Regions:
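Acidic, low-complexity central loop/insert segments
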Residues: 35, 54, 60-184, 209-225, ...
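ATP-binding N-lobe of GHMP and related small-molecule kinases
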Residues: 1-59, 105, 153
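Short beta-strand scaffold segments in enzyme catalytic cores
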Residues: 19-22, 46-48, 98-102, 158, ...
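Conserved phosphate-donor
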Residues: 41-56, 177-217
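Short, acidic/polar N-cap/turn motifs at the starts of alpha helices
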Residues: 9, 45, 88, 147-148, ...
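Short glycine/proline-enriched turns and hinge-like loops at secondary-structure junctions
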Residues: 14-17, 69-70, 200
Length: 237
């Protein structure tokens, strides 16, 4: 299986968010890609083959195909730099075109991601009540600094800003119910931002029902950022 596992957003060989990356000469079938993603078990795996002057890319979680994944694209940039040298690589996605820059600085890998177009819309009262009920929250648990919203940067996400870390620690939900709601609403991740002071407002917690995660991972918010640089590491061929 011609798959690499690469951790994006790492500091050298420490930490990061792992993704699978498959590079090939000919595209695989959907079922084959889905099986590889399920076997790897990472939240996303990127599959890329040459097309024209760039690369045709598709993303799969262990359970389904998704339209885009930022950290898997960062990992893909590192893999392309290792395989083809430093450069900017055009990427053709299911729903648009972007690029990723990959560079190998004497063994230290970096990638610069061009985000797909971003947008956001406010939640309706009915939507908000549905999500609060699912997650066991009340209106009083929400922060007044940032409105709940549906946000988009290549894929659709739900953002629920909370008033405190204590509220975040009370998070409780039924995994099957969460997966059902996300499938019905076309959501890829649910983000909760514990807005308890200025320092906390620069970080978001992301929960991924598709991978059935029992823990959460911290990421700097990049939804409304046009480009972001990230260190990556190659963990296994």
């Amino acid at each position: 299986m011609n798959v690499q596992e690469i951790a994006a957003f790492s500091d050298g060989a420490v930490g990061g968010n792992p993704a699978g990356v498959w590079l090939g000469d000919q595209p695989l079938g959907r079922d084959h890609m889905q099986a590889i993603a399920a076997e790897l078990g990472h939240s996303e795996t990127a599959f890329a083959v040459p097309e024209g002057t760039g690369w045709r890319v598709r993303y799969f979680s262990p359970a389904m195909e998704v339209p885009f994944c930022g950290h898997a694209t960062v990992a893909l940039g590192a893999a392309l730099a290792m395989a083809h040298g430093n450069g900017v690589f055009p990427l053709l996605l299911n729903d648009g075109e972007i690029s990723v820059e990959g560079r190998d600085h004497h063994g230290e890998l970096t990638a610069a991601l061009q985000s797909p177009p971003t947008s956001h819309t406010a939640l309706s009262d009915a939507q908000l009540m549905r999500y609060l009920s699912l997650l066991g929250y009340q209106h009083d648990d929400l922060s007044n600094d940032l409105p709940p919203a549906l946000i988009h940067a290549g894929a659709d996400h739900l953002l629920l800003p909370l008033s405190s870390r204590a509220a975040l620690s009370r998070l409780d939900y039924d995994l099957e119910a969460g997966a059902r709601v996300m499938r019905e609403d076309g959501l890829v991740t649910v983000m909760r931002d514990p807005c308890c002071g200025r320092s906390a407002r620069n970080r978001s917690l992301i929960f991924d029902y598709r991978a059935r995660l029992s823990a959460c991972a911290m990421f700097p918010p990049i939804v409304f950022v046009e480009r972001t640089r990230s260190c990556v590491r190659r963990s296994r061929e």
